[in-house]
Every structure is written in structure tokens, then in C-alpha cells.
């Protein structure tokens, strides 16, 4: 279990919060110096998401409202979610990022319904509000228990035919702790196990293509 890597929970969360307070509020900052992969990432995410938005019949996922978790300055909100949804809510632990988002998003930012400044371990989505809850590059900042609990709360936040998407780094064998930003990169089988523990069913899994060889494999998981 990856939580064995977390010796002190308070320190685990506090160290991460301090790390992000010192990151510049830019796309490059959000991506740890890999701002150049943003377009490839967003194009892959759009393709993955649209298979649910374009489904025929009664299983189609709606496009009224999405939630961007660990939203930062709004990189995903701006380029992926606002073009596809009528309203987007954003949640992030760093107040400076959410303040920057208001200028970064430009005119379309008027369609952001709520800016929530909160750690995901303490955040509860409004029940029955969201068609899509997008959780990218942030589950490593939650312990296993807090991730399972957060996913359970997210499930309650979904509208009919709504989905939760996790997109994150994974390893193929053992989970790895990053002491710099205080995060865990989990093995892929553990991610699947924690999703199942939360009472969710995986609908689709896809590896992001065309990323640099030196970074971890990145997978998207859709579930409800």
C-alpha cells in the first residue's frame, strides 16, 4: 500500500502545500517545467472525454457542469472543460493559483461557477451537480484512505450518466514517493484497487501517447 510511504500525514500535506506556494502561477509551473507537453495532454484528454459526451441514446454524459480538481491556474478548465461544458467549478489548495485563474481564463472565465480553495482531502462536491469530475495530476497528494473517501464523495456529486476521470502518473510495479513535492506515484494496479474500494466501476482506461520518454507513464481512468 502506498500510504506506508507516508510516515506523518500532517507533514505529508503541509510539505505539499508549501511546495505549491512557491511554484510560479504559469502553465510551465503547473506542469513542473514540462509546459511544452500541455497541448499533447489536452488533445489526448479531449479525445478520451468525447467518447462519453458523444454517446448515442440514454447513456450519454451531459455537458451542463464539470469540476476541475487540483485545477491550479485553470490550464485544463480553459482548454478542455470550458469549451465542452456550460459551467465549470474549480478546486485547488493554493489561493494564488485560483486568483491567477481569473485573469488567465479571460472572457470565458465568466462561466466558472465557483472557485473553491480547499485540499481535496477536505472537499465535498455538491451532490448531483456534476456531469464530469476531472482529477488530473493530483491524486498523488492524497493518502490511500483519503483518495478512496474523496472518490466516494465525488460519486455522490455526479448527475445521471456522470463520470469521474482520473488522469495521472502511474508505475508498473512499486509506488514511489517524491520528497520534493510530497506526492506518491502509485502502481497502476493499486489505482484500480482504490477505485474499486470506493465502489466505482471503471468504464475505460487509456495510456496517454506521445509524452517524453523520461516521465512516468500517464493513464486516464473513467469511472462511475
UniProtKB/Swiss-Prot annotation:
The keyword Transferase applies. GO terms for biological process: chromosome segregation; N-terminal peptidyl-glycine methylation; N-terminal peptidyl-proline dimethylation; N-terminal peptidyl-serine dimethylation; N-terminal peptidyl-serine trimethylation; spindle organization. Its EC number is 2.1.1.244. Keywords: Methyltransferase, Nucleus, S-adenosyl-L-methionine, Transferase. S-adenosyl-L-methionine binds at residues 70, 75, 92-94, 120-121, 136. One of its GO terms (molecular function) is protein methyltransferase activity. Distributive alpha-N-methyltransferase that methylates the N-terminus of target proteins containing the N-terminal motif [Ala/Gly/Pro/Ser]-Pro-Lys when the initiator Met is cleaved. Specifically catalyzes mono-, di- or tri-methylation of the exposed alpha-amino group of the Ala, Gly or Ser residue in the [Ala/Gly/Ser]-Pro-Lys motif and mono- or di-methylation of Pro in the Pro-Pro-Lys motif. Required during mitosis for normal bipolar spindle formation and chromosome segregation via its action on target proteins. This is N-terminal Xaa-Pro-Lys N-methyltransferase 1-A. It comes from Xenopus laevis.
Amino acid at each position: 500500500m502506498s500510504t506506508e510511504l507516508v510516515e506523518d500525514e500532517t507533514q505529508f500535506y503541509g510539505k505539499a502545500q508549501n511546495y505549491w506556494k512557491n511554484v510560479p502561477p504559469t502553465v510551465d509551473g503547473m506542469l513542473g517545467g514540462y509546459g511544452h507537453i500541455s497541448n499533447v495532454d489536452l488533445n489526448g484528454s479531449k479525445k478520451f472525454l468525447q467518447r462519453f459526451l458523444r454517446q448515442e441514446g440514454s447513456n450519454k454524459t451531459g455537458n451542463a457542469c464539470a469540476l476541475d480538481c487540483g485545477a491550479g491556474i485553470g490550464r485544463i478548465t480553459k482548454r478542455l472543460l470550458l469549451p465542452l461544458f456550460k459551467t465549470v467549478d474549480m478546486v485547488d489548495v493554493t489561493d494564488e493559483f485560483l486568483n491567477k485563474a481569473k485573469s488567465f481564463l479571460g472572457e470565458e472565465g465568466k462561466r466558472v461557477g465557483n472557485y473553491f480553495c480547499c485540499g481535496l482531502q477536505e472537499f465535498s462536491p455538491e451532490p448531483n451537480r456534476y456531469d464530469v469530475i476531472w482529477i488530473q495530476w493530483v491524486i498523488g497528494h492524497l493518502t490511500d484512505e483519503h483518495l478512496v473517501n474523496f472518490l466516494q464523495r465525488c460519486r455522490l456529486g455526479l448527475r445521471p450518466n456522470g463520470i469521474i476521470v482520473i488522469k495521472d502518473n502511474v508505475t508498473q510495479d512499486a509506488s514511489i514517493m517524491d520528497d520534493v513535492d510530497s506526492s506518491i506515484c502509485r502502481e497502476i494496479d493499486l489505482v484500480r484497487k482504490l477505485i474499486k474500494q470506493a465502489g466505482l466501476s471503471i468504464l475505460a482506461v487509456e495510456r496517454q501517447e506521445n509524452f517524453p520518454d523520461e516521465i512516468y507513464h500517464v493513464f486516464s481512468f473513467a469511472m462511475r
